[in-house]
Regions:
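N-terminal mature-domain "stem" immediately C-terminal to a signal peptide or N-terminal signal-anchor/transmembrane
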Residues: 22-89
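C-terminal motif of bacterial Sec signal peptides marking the signal peptidase cleavage site
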Residues: 18-20
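Positively charged n-region of N-terminal signal peptides that target proteins for export
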Residues: 1-7
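Acidic/His-rich structured neighborhood in mature extracellular/periplasmic domains
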Residues: 90-246
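Residues that form generic nucleotide/phosphate-binding pockets
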Residues: 45, 60-64, 71, 75, ...
Length: 310
């Protein structure tokens, strides 16, 4: 670790300046009370409509879930406003595809009860609110996307695509996802992804997306904060690593830094190279053993080490 400190000593000032912005608490607050969080089950309501095709439910959906219909329509189905004629016909057509419909029913069955996730979100958002007093706590929902993006965020709204969290052994995943992707598709990471999605929505990336150091510190800061909010999730789990892969990173941290610096990847504005460091795919361009998303892991180490010195 002493060698590591020497190598990245020149990075401390930049890391600290980024991590000390208004979005990062300078003094960590540990609240004792917990905010109650209730997840609104848009997923169940929409499935009831899809299965019955009862047009009277359309008005109920428009009344109860107007924002969710809008964001799911635009973000997943590429549809315009729910008020437009034919909107619900296209929703039914999309979700009636046999494989997707079975996936939808499996997901709703798996997430019939979500008290465990609500409790985690309560603790997590309580921590965020204590340390980010101006942060708005969103209304939380669940939906099924058909393997689209994990989290949808809009003004005061946050929704998780539960079909992406069925457990790495879920049969359908075997045909669509690699091992390194499936390890993240677990219920135990649902709350963490809710929080990460909201942090990214509230505090979007403002650096140069082509510069590796900018991206590493931003992604590392998100992991750092989520881990503080949900400490029961291990760093390996939060990274989507096997324990052996996480231990490899710790043991080879100095070597990783030497390689990155020697190749001049840290500051060079190169979108292709930078994206490789943040891809879930194993980073074999560094070594055969390097796990994916190594840029985020290194960023997390920079943030953690830098804040110790503030």
């Amino acid at each position: 670790m002493k060698n590591m400190k020497k190598i990245i000593g020149s990075l401390f000032f930049l890391a600290i300046s980024i991590c000390s912005c208004n979005s990062q608490p300078s003094n960590i607050q540990t609240p004792t009370d917990t905010l109650p969080i209730h997840i609104q089950r848009f997923d169940k309501a929409l499935l009831a409509y899809i299965e019955t095709q009862d047009t009277t439910l359309e008005k109920e959906l428009l009344k109860e879930y107007p924002a969710m219909l809008d964001i799911v329509g635009k973000g997943i189905l590429n549809l315009q406003s729910p008020e437009v004629s034919g909107f619900f016909d296209q929703v039914i057509a999309y979700y009636s595809e046999p494989t997707l419909k079975n996936l939808y029913k499996d997901a709703v069955r798996e997430y019939d009860h979500v008290t465990d996730i609500e409790n985690q979100l309560g603790k997590g958002f309580t921590f965020l609110k204590a340390n980010f007093p101006n942060m708005q706590i969103p209304a939380c929902y669940m939906h099924v996307s058909g393997f689209n993006q994990n989290v949808l965020a809009a003004d005061s709204l946050l929704s998780l695509s539960i079909d992406k969290y069925m457990g790495e052994a879920y049969p359908l995943y075997q045909d669509f996802f690699y091992d390194y992707q499936r390890i993240k598709m677990q219920r135990t990471l649902a709350a963490a992804d809710y929080l990460a999605g909201w942090l990214m929505s509230e505090y979007p990336f403002e650096g140069n997306e082509n510069i590796l150091l900018d991206r590493m510190i931003y992604e590392g800061k998100i992991k750092y904060i989520v881990h503080l909010a949900l400490p029961e999730i291990t760093p390996a789990q939060l990274m989507g690593y096997q324990e052996k892969d996480y231990e490899w990173c710790v043991s080879n941290e100095l070597t990783l830094w030497n390689t990155i610096i020697q190749r001049k990847h840290l500051y060079t504005p190169d979108q292709i190279t930078t994206s490789k460091y943040l891809d879930d795919k194993p980073c074999t361009f560094l070594s055969d053993e390097t796990p994916g998303n190594i840029g985020t892991w290194i960023g997390w180490q920079i943030v953690s080490l830098s804040l110790i010195h503030i």
